[in-house]
Amino acid sequence: MIKFLFIFLSIITVSIKTNANTFFGVDKNDYSSVERAFKTETPPLFQYKGNKFCKGGTLYMTPYDKFNKSKKSHTSGKLKSWFFALSFGHAISSYLEGEYHSDLVHLKEDFINEYIPYLVKAAENKYFTVNKWTKGGSSVAYSQYMILINLSVFMDFMDNKNLWKTGQREKIVKWGDILYERSHYNHYANGGRKQHHRWPDTVSKAAAAYMLWGFVNKDLKKFKDGYRDLMQEYKKIPADGKYHQHFKGPYAGEIMDSWDLYLENKTLGDLVIASYVGELVGMKTFRKLNKKGGSIIKAIDYLGQISSNPNELKGQDERHLNNMRADGNSWMTVYRKLDKTDNNPLVNLHLKTSEEKGYGFSQILNFSRCIDNELK
């Protein structure tokens, strides 16, 4: 009987390992540089110094609940969780505005005395952790990635400003870990969906979210999870940079034909963010060539070419060219930290258009030019 039980457990163990490797593939990436970095004090993600872009931030403390509900379609408007995700960037900007202007010091006090308790309460009440999908509707997991991206930056800000009170950080990490787990398509909370059901824009958003969450908490498991997602898309980039997934690719027209280039822009932007986090801990992808001869910077170079070509722009919404309208351009701040040449026409365009609001309208990394005024 004991021998039989041993054999049975061995089979189960092998099966689990096989399934894990089938799902992820055998992870042959060398994470030694990440392990070393996580054993020491990691650098801050951004500068977090008050500047002219730190204006207009508001302490949004809207009460929500644990339900993360979908809309009927991808074009039905923003989810409540999206508005919640915006609150982190607003709060950081408000604090830094108070730091930048001595006559607005009350903004810092309100941040500490009002917003932080609100956020801790949100963590205790597990905001947006119970997923409610609508058939054919927008992805609720995607909104959890958005929360994790902005929450990660917020936590990095708090860490580097030494603003935590006893027990606050632990409560928020516990909540964030639930968001992380339930954002996986194959989690039981997501109605039988599978990881391979994700579109490239979803994979790239997960890559940025998981790598950031792993970075700020020095959690190697979660960082690896995100890095595998980054690799999934990074490996697709050819030597000429023509990523072509949502634009002229297999996912073209899945939502609206006119959104193809806009979605390609958001997808590649999230890959830039993920690549940046990797670069901070020695995992190179921004300029490093993959087996096809492609890299992140090559994909962005090509994106810049087509985004400034009138023939390629025909029939496209062009919202990714308009900082005041789009929700996916704040990654330009991160890009300029990695490449300061300004040779890319799309990057150069956003350097000019962001002078007014500093990406205050973006869904992720909103107020990015406030949290890191990347130009020296």
Model-derived segments and spans:
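Sec-dependent N-terminal signal peptides
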Residues: 4-13
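Aromatic-lined, polymer-binding surfaces characteristic
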Residues: 76-283, 293
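Low-complexity, Ser/Thr/Pro/Gly-enriched N-terminal "stalk/linker" regions
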Residues: 21-78
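Terminal, non-catalytic domain-edge segments
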Residues: 21-40, 44, 273, 277, ...
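Short secondary-structure subsegments characteristic of cysteine-rich extracellular domains
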Residues: 287-303
